């Protein structure tokens, strides 16, 4: 049995995530900030995550597709019905931030929204050049497929709320696989935003 883990800031809960996988999940948090003026040049910042495994990119794209299918259908998050929401569009800056965080978690063997160097999701997103008014992040580990990761997030009230939030318009997904030397092997980050 694979151990799937999906965490956002808050108290730990244990829940079944479908597909024979179990997950540990936390409550979700969204952050809001005034839209920043100007554009941050982020090409050098994102250099280490531009070239990516084709298989990993396919997984990331599948997550976007699955999330948009869930948004189009509407969903129940923690017993509360969420109406259908507009499709999210891929944002390469958010993908850069998500990839950097998944890579950091896998290579440095940790699982948290806070990076190994103390960075926050907000700092990664800004460093990648995304000026936002609202952002949210879902992370997961141990899920071996995009479907399992999305199912795990949808089974968590906070993660589901992030996915179904109609105010969020953009998504970047980062997937990183490290078979040996990491705790969970599969690491996922979803960074959502609105400008």
Question: Where would I find each of the regions flagged by the language model?
Answer:
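Bacterial N-terminal signal peptides that target proteins for export
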Residues: 1-7
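C-terminal motif of bacterial Sec signal peptides marking the signal peptidase cleavage site
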Residues: 13-16
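Bacterial signal peptide processing site
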Residues: 18-21
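Post-signal peptide N-terminal segment of mature Sec-exported envelope proteins
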Residues: 24-51
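Disulfide-stabilized extracellular recognition modules
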Residues: 43-45, 132, 140-195
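A short alpha-helix/helix-coil micro-patch that ends at or immediately precedes a cysteine
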Residues: 44-108
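Bacterial peptidoglycan biogenesis and beta-lactam-recognition machinery
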Residues: 77, 111, 159-161
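Short, surface-exposed glycine/acidic/tryptophan-bearing loops
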Residues: 91-144, 163
